[in-house]
């Protein structure tokens, strides 16, 4: 928001001669040519960097499979607001600062001020909506994730922009305007105390308080659930379960014990030389459902375990260990039986082999399917947790960038000259707030590997294509 702590108004009776004298004494620009060139270069670089960085964010979310989650549409809308700040607000703020007056006319002054307040307000309301989205995904993991569709997220984004407009536009009705015949007109907001305080509270302090309280609540819930999850994971020594619900044998068990435990099949010879294959289907069915229930509870708790990390290298190592164990178990699977009739034993052995192979194939397929589902869920959970941390950093940086400006501006509204900071310092706080629009892509690049990979893919893929051509 291009706000001036001082105004250049003069009494209507003195406008004949004193006004012209003061305007002749006052230079059009308060900076030397070298300072003008330096400031123009720095701010121009900031504008270009903001546009390019946020365009990359939009392209990454819309094209990367890893960023296809509906909630990432919030980042698209937030990046769009930053792009609009860099294109429709910052260039005119720079010109107004360097020229020391408003050159672009009264109509564009009204539009410029309205857009400036709107984009600043929408940024923090976006962050407030994102914090609520993260809170619901933590406290209502299963139910809210089912409702979190692209259509619902788009509806929330439209609501965010409407709320921002409602907060921003009404106070702009009473803008301060210099007389039309002023040689150096100024484009300034209402300087009255009620407007300064209402705009500061509505555009910054109220959403900021909501955002901070929500994230404190997220942290507390996550910490409590993580402690509960660690207690649930505690199991007695010497006992464990496989992914299909069967009990694993002790570490020192022999091959025959391992085979019997893995297949849960038993062969008994009757008095008449016939063989009976007893498949403990009911026992396995019971164990499977019991373990599935435990897995579901564990998965729900893992939704809010912020400390969990899931990397592709760890998944490959775990998968290779499980496949090696499965191969070892299948090799160790053996049957021993005795019979008085060789033909009968050969036939029974053949039937037993086919039955055991079908059983092993069923459990192996079921286990692979369940392992794949759990792996996908864990990857999604880990990505959610990493991005929750990234968004907490984004919100913290936003508050740090904009708090000095809104704090000093609200102080000026309360006690005027007694609390007024030096004009140079106030302008510095004002431009630090604008710098925030360029920082989100940097934060995504540093703290989120999905964005980092996507940015590299977008930039270097295009370079490779041009080099090949």
Curated annotation (Swiss-Prot):
The record marks 199, 203 as: Implicated in catechol agonist binding and receptor activation. It is found in: Cell membrane. Glycans are attached at residues 8, 20. GO terms for cellular component: plasma membrane. The keyword Transmembrane helix applies. Belongs to the G-protein coupled receptor 1 family. Adrenergic receptor subfamily. ADRA2C sub-subfamily. This is Alpha-2C adrenergic receptor. PANTHER family: ADRENERGIC RECEPTOR-RELATED G-PROTEIN COUPLED RECEPTOR (PTHR24248), ALPHA-2C ADRENERGIC RECEPTOR (PTHR24248:SF25). Disulfide bonds join 109-187. Residues 331-353 have a biased composition (Low complexity). It comes from Didelphis virginiana. The gene is ADRA2C. It is a multi-pass membrane protein. GO terms for biological process: platelet activation; regulation of smooth muscle contraction; regulation of vasoconstriction. One of its GO terms (molecular function) is epinephrine binding. Residues 1-29, 232-261, 279-353 are annotated as: Disordered. Residues 1-36, 100-109, 176-194, 408-427 are extracellular.
């Amino acid at each position: 928001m291009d706000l001036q702590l001082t105004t250049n108004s003069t009494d209507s009776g003195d406008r004949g001669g004193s006004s012209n004298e003061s305007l002749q004494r006052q230079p059009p620009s308060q900076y030397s040519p070298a300072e003008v060139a330096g400031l123009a270069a720095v701010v121009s670089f900031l504008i270009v960097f903001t546009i390019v960085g946020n365009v990359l964010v939009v392209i990454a979310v819309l094209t990367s499979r890893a960023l296809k989650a509906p909630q990432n549409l919030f980042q698209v809308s937030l990046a769009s607001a930053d792009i609009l700040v860099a294109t429709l607000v910052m260039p005119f703020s720079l010109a107004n600062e360097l020229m020391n007056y408003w050159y672009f006319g009264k109509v564009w002054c009204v539009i410029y001020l309205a857009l400036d307040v709107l984009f600043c307000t929408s940024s923090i309301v976006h962050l407030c909506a994102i914090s609520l989205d993260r809170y619901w995904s933590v406290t209502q993991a299963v139910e809210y994730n089912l409702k979190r569709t692209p259509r619902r997220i788009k509806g929330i984004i439209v609501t965010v922009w409407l709320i921002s407009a409602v907060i921003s536009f009404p106070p702009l009705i009473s803008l301060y305007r210099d007389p039309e015949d002023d040689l150096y007109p100024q484009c300034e907001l209402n300087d009255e105390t009620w407007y300064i305080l209402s705009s500061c509270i509505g555009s910054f302090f109220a959403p900021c308080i909501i955002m901070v309280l929500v994230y404190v609540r997220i942290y507390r819930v996550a910490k409590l659930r993580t402690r509960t999850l660690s207690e649930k994971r505690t199991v007695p020594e010497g006992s464990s379960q496989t992914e299909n619900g069967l009990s694993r044998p002790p570490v020192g068990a022999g091959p025959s014990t391992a085979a019997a435990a893995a297949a849960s099949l038993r062969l008994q010879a009757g008095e008449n030389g016939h063989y009976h294959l007893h498949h403990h289907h009911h026992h396995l069915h019971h164990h499977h459902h019991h373990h599935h229930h435990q897995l579901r509870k564990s998965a729900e708790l893992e939704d809010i375990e912020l400390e969990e990390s899931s990397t592709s290298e760890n998944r490959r190592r775990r998968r290779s260990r499980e496949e090696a164990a499965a191969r070892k178990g299948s090799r160790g699977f053996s049957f021993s039986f005795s019979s008085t009739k060789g033909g009968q034993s050969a036939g029974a052995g053949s039937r037993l082999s086919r039955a055991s192979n079908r059983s092993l194939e069923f459990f192996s397929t079921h286990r692979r399917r369940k392992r794949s589902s759990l792996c996908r869920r864990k990857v999604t959970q880990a990505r959610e947790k990493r991005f929750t941390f990234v968004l907490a950093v984004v919100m913290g940086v936003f508050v740090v960038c904009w708090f000095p400006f809104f704090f000093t501006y609200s102080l000026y509204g309360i006690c005027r000259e007694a609390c007024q900071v030096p004009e140079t310092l106030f302008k510095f706080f004002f431009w630090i707030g604008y710098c925030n629009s360029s920082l989100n892509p940097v934060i995504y690049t540093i703290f989120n590997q999905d964005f980092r990979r996507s940015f590299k893919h977008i930039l270097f893929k295009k370079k490779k294509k041009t080099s090949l051509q």
